[in-house]
Amino acid sequence: MKLQFTKMHGAGNDFIVLDGIHQKLDLTDAQWRALANRHFGIGADQILIVEKSSRDDVDFRYRIVNADGGEVEHCGNGARCFVRFVTDRGMTDKQSVRVEVMNGVITLKLQDDGQVTVDMGEPELTPARVPFIADGLPTRAEAQDTLYGLEVNGRTEWISPVSMGNPHAVQIVDDVEQFPVLQDGPVIEHHKSFPNRVNAGFMQIVDRNTVRLRVFERGAGETLACGTGACAAVVAGIRRGLLDSPVKVHTHGGDLTIAWQGAGQPVQMTGPATTVFEGTIDLSTLPA
């Protein structure tokens, strides 16, 4: 079986994009993992699938498969690549596209300068809906936010749980480049307080409109950028009274701009979406 694919990235967060409307996609978990493998497959942080939606008020369905073969709820950088893909392929001529994801509907808009703005929806801040189990954990209040203390590698680290359609734990650090992200990230990802695991975000505040961010993504490890992670980090920073909208988020892969006007309002994310190359791969050549 041969698959046509497009390799894309959003601020260095890289994806395999597959048209699931004009070709059949019936892959096993092992085949998804093999596609994402950087040594034996194409290589990517995640695989994005374009499908038809069953809803009349939605243009497409958007599915995301992690490098570990598991399907996840949302990916903001991937959403920007998604709308660039369907536009460049002539699958839509709309400037604003509504897309169905696992937990709802998002709106994607192409800007005149080539950037893409994604309406990411409202953040979910109720712990049980992240989901996050807070029972027995120490807490402390900062402005409008409640922080929870997690035991991580012998230290208590204070995190803000936020869902952007997928779960995030946001931690503020003094120097994100010196912080042990690769050591603490896996511990937080698999912490028992997050029943579905979690994306661990480490944010350094530069000023009230600028941050530096690293994210250890659930099922993918540290990536060059994480769109939902950038949104969750800015929401946490604003709720803690440390940031003002809009916020420029510097990641290792590039910059994102995040805007949020507070409770009851959606988060807006703007950033790049770039096509790297296209090709065809024979699944029979991949390791089982």
Curated annotation (Swiss-Prot):
Keywords: Amino-acid biosynthesis, Cytoplasm, Isomerase, Lysine biosynthesis. Its EC number is 5.1.1.7. Gene3D superfamilies: Diaminopimelate Epimerase, Chain A, domain 1. Pfam families: DAP_epimerase (PF01678). It is found in: Cytoplasm. The keyword Nucleus does not apply. The record marks 168, 217 as: Could be important to modulate the pK values of the two catalytic cysteine residues. It catalyses: (2S,6S)-2,6-diaminopimelate = meso-2,6-diaminopimelate. It comes from the Bacteria. Coiled coil: none annotated. Signal peptide: none annotated. Substrate binds at residues 13, 46, 66, 76-77, 166, 199, 217-218, 227-228. Belongs to the diaminopimelate epimerase family. NCBIfam families: DapF. HAMAP family: DAP_epimerase. This is Diaminopimelate epimerase. It comes from Cupriavidus metallidurans (strain ATCC 43123 / DSM 2839 / NBRC 102507 / CH34).
